[in-house]
Curated annotation (Swiss-Prot):
Its cofactor is Mg(2+). It comes from the Bacteria. HAMAP family: IlvC. Involved in the biosynthesis of branched-chain amino acids (BCAA). Catalyzes an alkyl-migration followed by a ketol-acid reduction of (S)-2-acetolactate (S2AL) to yield (R)-2,3-dihydroxy-isovalerate. In the isomerase reaction, S2AL is rearranged via a Mg-dependent methyl migration to produce 3-hydroxy-3-methyl-2-ketobutyrate (HMKB). In the reductase reaction, this 2-ketoacid undergoes a metal-dependent reduction by NADPH to yield (R)-2,3-dihydroxy-isovalerate. This is Ketol-acid reductoisomerase (NADP(+)).
């Protein structure tokens, strides 16, 4: 097998990268009816597997789980999750032959083994689904010609997919059909029905491609979503403690600060996040963000280039073959950082506004990181809608994992693929941020409020205009408006 993207000519590459269409609500008028009465078998019962399955069952679909024999006999976590929620569970041999749609929701590194095991068992003309296209695009998996291959990729962790569905909404979702595997022309109907069953059509669906989803997803998770948060957490905590701050206070400011700060992104983008600062602090955050871009933009572009070329995937798959030696070593090193071992902040109170006032450089890191990731994706041919979802939109969700159990929780919740890319980025970004940004911070940049200063009205006006007119803000306003409309529709019943 060889990297599918690299087998395409330039025109085909640009076409696949640029596949992005925001679908109309009317296109989902039939809901998930196309899949009703069909047997759907999910392989894997982790966060995405369980929660998508719960949503699909609640939408009226026939869902069961195919697990490896040892997972069943040893009653492993996947078996317990499925059975405790009342699902039928069986081996591949028991369930796959009668399945109309097999959905592969195992980790990326297991996909080739899953395909090799289930493909001979699948009936003629069945369908095969993914929620991430890595196996097709980067590994170059070849699927039987009679099988339809589709993707439904919720832009949230599995737990969020379930919680949003339970409150009558959903999460933004990308869907795609693999052009090499749509023999009956039913791929889009299957993908739409699957997305509707998970609740994705209530929040907005992008018709994309396997290529666009993979390249943008890898870029977002490696840089702003995980890598920047990890690097920022480590250097900001170290700086606070070095400046004499109580380690417990420093740990809490960082651990919960990302979540509080990025919650503003969800409601009003970078504009609202920056508006939470005083004028003096906003100016300083803007200036710090520009400095961060000067020192880190090369790294964002390198990651984008390595993702497009396939260099990243080749490097990671070599580590898979080596027993994940690098991944495990980096994971262990992260667990030993001072931030991860900061004392608990029992009794320490930090108000919502204090997280903004005492975290100006954190706000700057978020602003710079979102804009650099978005710009790098768009410059590489990825459409703005996809770039928005893979940078700004998912950030509050990842920040929430840090609030729960710091970097450990983030790296547990995200995939091994995301975790590996996170370390590649943060291992380089951390010393750069420490030397070029954090060591140069002024009073009021971190740990205490920015001192009030005389404000140049013209300078402030220009900064505000620059913030509000960045392309990520313009497309974000449009997409968030759609989601607001959808929430209003769902709340009315």
């Amino acid at each position: 097998m060889s990297n599918y993207f690299n087998t395409l000519n330039l025109r085909q590459k640009l076409d696949q990268l640029g596949r992005c269409r925001f679908m109309e609500r009317s296109e989902f008028a039939d809901g998930c009816n196309f899949l009703k009465g069909k047997k759907i078998v999910i392989v894997g019962c982790g966060a995405q597997g369980l929660n998508q399955g719960l949503n699909m069952r609640d939408s009226g679909l026939d869902i069961s789980y195919a697990l490896r024999p040892e997972a069943i006999t040893e009653k492993r976590a996947s078996f317990q999750r499925a059975t405790e929620n009342g699902f039928k569970v069986g081996t591949y041999q028991e369930l796959i032959p009668t399945a109309d749609l097999v959905v592969n929701l195992t980790p990326d590194k297991q996909h080739s083994k899953v395909v090799a095991d289930v493909m001979p068992l699948m009936k003629q003309g069945a369908s095969f689904g993914y929620s991430h296209g890595f196996n097709i695009v980067e590994v170059g998996e070849q699927i039987r010609e009679d099988i339809t291959v589709v993707m439904v990729a919720p832009k949230c962790p599995g737990t969020e997919v379930r919680e949003e569905y339970k409150r009558g909404f959903g999460v933004p979702t990308l869907i795609a059909v693999h052009p090499a595997n749509d023999p009956k022309g039913e791929g889009m109907a299957i993908a739409k029905a699957w997305a509707s069953a998970t609740g994705g059509d209530r929040a907005g669906v992008l018709e994309s491609s396997f290529v666009a989803e993979v390249k943008s997803d890898l870029m977002g998770e490696q840089t702003i979503l995980c890598g920047m948060l990890q690097a920022g957490s480590i250097v900001c905590y170290d700086k606070l403690v070095a400046d004499g701050k109580d380690p417990a206070y420093a740990g809490k400011l960082i651990q919960y600060g990302w979540e509080t700060i990025t919650e503003a992104l969800k409601q009003g983008g970078i504009t609202l996040m920056m508006d939470r600062l005083s004028n003096s602090a906003k100016i300083r955050a803007f200036e710090l963000a520009e400095e961060i871009k000067e020192h880190l933009n090369f790294l964002y572009l390198k990651h984008m280039d390595d993702i497009i070329s396939g260099e990243f995937s080749a490097t990671m798959m070599a580590d898979w073959a080596n027993g994940d030696k690098d991944l495990f070593a980096w994971r262990e090193a992260t667990g030993k950082t001072a931030f991860e071992n900061a004392p608990k902040a029992d009794g320490i109170k930090i108000s919502e506004q204090e997280y903004f006032d005492n975290g100006v450089v954190m706000v700057a890191m978020v602003k710079a990181g979102v804009e650099m990731a978005f710009d790098a994706m768009v410059a590489s041919g990825i459409y703005e809608e996809s770039a928005y979802y893979e940078s700004l939109h998912e950030l509050p969700l990842i920040a929430n994992t840090i609030a729960r159990k710091r970097l450990y929780e983030m790296n547990v919740v995200i995939s091994d693929t995301a975790e590996y890319g996170n370390y590649l980025f943060s291992n380089v970004a951390t010393p750069i941020l420490a030397k070029e940004i954090v060591s140069q911070l002024k009073r009021g940049d971190l740990g205490e409020p920015t001192p009030a200063a005389e404000i140049d009205n013209v300078y402030l006006r220009d900064i505000n205009d620059t913030i509000r007119n960045h392309p990520v803000e313009l497309i974000g306003q449009e997409l968030r408006g759609y989601m607001t409309d959808m929430k209003r529709i769902s709340s009315q019943g």
